[in-house]
């Protein structure tokens, strides 16, 4: 298990991703596991993240924040020579977070990242990037990001019936610069989030919000109402074109919550998720 003594440089890694993206071909995922021990949280950075995602400023880490800490390790793995798919152009389909207990800003963390479960998708191939946070050797947080690489799919997707969105419990104005602001705190400087001209090269009419920002923004709306241990699943649907006006709706489902984010004018879905008590 390769052990990292410092956080990987994302600027250099994204440059590498652009230069090597067209040469990546493969059929197997690497079995590499990256680990970075003794990670401390920068309080200033945490506060900036809280403000961008609209979490309260506390000594407890938002449930989505460890994803940001592990993201450089994910990018390092996805830009290694043995990784079969290019980073640029991979689509974030879904994200699951399992929180066993809250994390505090003064705890020393060990980050661990690996990739698994390569499988067919109607539009190509998909795989799971697994991130873990351990404290004193005990796992306390797990994130599963499912990515799609388009091309050579297994068949056509089933047509989706149009479903009218629920009545929003809140309407949020998403500013045009949220992609750049979230990129500054997350390190995710994929060009589709930064500028409309760059986004058009990838088929988007305008820059789009990060999927993990939309998930974080939704979970910020639940602060003070969630248990200490829970699992939150999200499926990303249509992108949020910036600037935007979005509707947010939440409802109780069994013992947990269901929530949706959608275009406030057209009802086009951006995200659907559930929060389930327990881990």
List each model region and its residues.
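Hot-dog-fold acyl-thioester-processing enzymes
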Residues: 1-94, 154-225
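Hydrophobic residues on conserved beta-strands that form the core of alpha/beta folds
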Residues: 34-36, 142, 229-231
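HotDog/MaoC-like acyl-thioester-processing domains
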Residues: 1-29, 73-75, 93-174, 242, ...
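Hydrophobic beta-strand-centered segment that forms part of the acyl-chain substrate-binding groove
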Residues: 61-115, 125, 214-249, 256
């Amino acid at each position: 298990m390769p052990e990292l003594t410092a956080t990987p440089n994302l600027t250099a890694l994204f440059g590498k991703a652009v230069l090597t993206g067209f040469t990546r071909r493969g059929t197997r995922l690497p079995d590499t596991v990256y680990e970075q021990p003794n990670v401390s949280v920068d309080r200033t950075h945490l506060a900036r993240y809280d403000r961008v995602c609209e979490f309260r400023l506390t000594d407890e880490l938002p449930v989505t924040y460890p994803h940001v800490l592990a993201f450089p390790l994910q990018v390092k793995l996805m830009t290694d020579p043995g990784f079969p798919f290019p980073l640029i152009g991979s689509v974030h389909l879904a994200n699951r977070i399992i929180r066993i207990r809250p994390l505090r800003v003064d705890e020393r963390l060990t980050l661990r990242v690996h990739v698994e479960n390569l499988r067919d998708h109607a539009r190509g191939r998909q795989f799971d990037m697994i991130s873990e946070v351990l404290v004193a050797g005990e796992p306390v947080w797990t994130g599963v990001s499912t990515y799609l690489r388009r091309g050579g799919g297994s068949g056509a997707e089933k047509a989706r019936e149009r479903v009218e969105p629920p009545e929003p419990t809140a309407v949020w104005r998403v500013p045009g610069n949220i992609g750049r602001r979230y990129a500054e705190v997350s390190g995710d400087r994929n060009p589709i989030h930064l500028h409309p001209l760059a986004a058009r090269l990838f088929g988007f009419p305008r820059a789009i919000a990060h999927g993990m920002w939309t998930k974080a923004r939704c979970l910020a709306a639940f602060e003070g109402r969630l248990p200490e241990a829970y699992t939150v699943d999200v499926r990303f649907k249509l992108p949020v074109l910036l600037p935007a006006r979005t509707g947010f709706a939440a409802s109780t489902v069994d013992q947990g919550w269901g929530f949706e984010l959608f275009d406030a004018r057209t009802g086009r879905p951006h995200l659907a998720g559930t929060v389930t008590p327990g881990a």
